[in-house]
Amino acid sequence: MREALRSLLVALQFLTRLPVRLSAMPTPEQFGRAVLCYPLVGVLIGVVLYAAARSLDGTPPLLQAALLLSLWVALSGALHLDGLADMADAWVGGLGDRERTLAIMKDPRSGPVAVVVLVLVLLLKFSALAALLGQGEAGLLPLAPWLARSSLPLLFLTTPYARPGGLGQAIAEHLPARSLPWVLGVSFGLALAFGLAGLLALLVTLMLFAWLRSRFLARLGGTTGDTAGALVELTECAVLVALAL
């Protein structure tokens, strides 16, 4: 039980800006085990968003959507948005070359492509949130962060790490590979409790995952922390849009 709790705390500290403080820096093995808790972190984010949406009942949908999106970004500390921005710059500037793409992803500066992609993704999220709230479907909000963070263990389990060294490789090398399929099966299966909406969200998640993973492999031969972050953001966006249509 103590190890399970520590794994959850490591995952919360890594994926969110919630005030979680550990007594010592987690080991690579602990970072690897924490991947089991990524779906649960997504559930917790979703519950916070749902509770916030309910507390804002009666607020105009556009303002409510803006406040929820701001909270959403704050909860993750824009961690995954940063990965999306880096990947967008690298995918365009890399000109199809693996080494050039990896080099651009390490550059902390953001170019115009990154800015445009971030604006478009946030605009789509905002619009989809406003539509869902206007339809009285706030109860579906947890599906987006939940399934997006469930896709991370699937990515790490099925895709080699493209860049030697760093935290990403340490996580990849210490994945609890035997337990992950069970965790993923439960996480994806529970999404079906949302009925047809859950089935739609799950199908969108898996289809987008398969397509993005194929792009990562074709360009990089694997994944990186930035592409993992981009996967989260794009999955959240796609699920929200699909549910709002």
From Swiss-Prot:
Keywords: Cell inner membrane, Cell membrane, Cobalamin biosynthesis, Magnesium, Membrane, Transferase, Transmembrane, Transmembrane helix
Membrane-spanning parts: 31-51, 61-81, 113-133, 138-158, 192-212
Family indicated by similarity: Belongs to the CobS family.
EC primary class: transferase
Protein's membrane topology: Multi-pass membrane protein
UniProt lineage: Bacteria, Pseudomonadati, Pseudomonadota, Gammaproteobacteria, Pseudomonadales
Protein name: Adenosylcobinamide-GDP ribazoletransferase
Role description: Joins adenosylcobinamide-GDP and alpha-ribazole to generate adenosylcobalamin (Ado-cobalamin). Also synthesizes adenosylcobalamin 5'-phosphate from adenosylcobinamide-GDP and alpha-ribazole 5'-phosphate.
Organism in which the protein naturally occurs: Pseudomonas aeruginosa (strain ATCC 15692 / DSM 22644 / CIP 104116 / JCM 14847 / LMG 12228 / 1C / PRS 101 / PAO1)
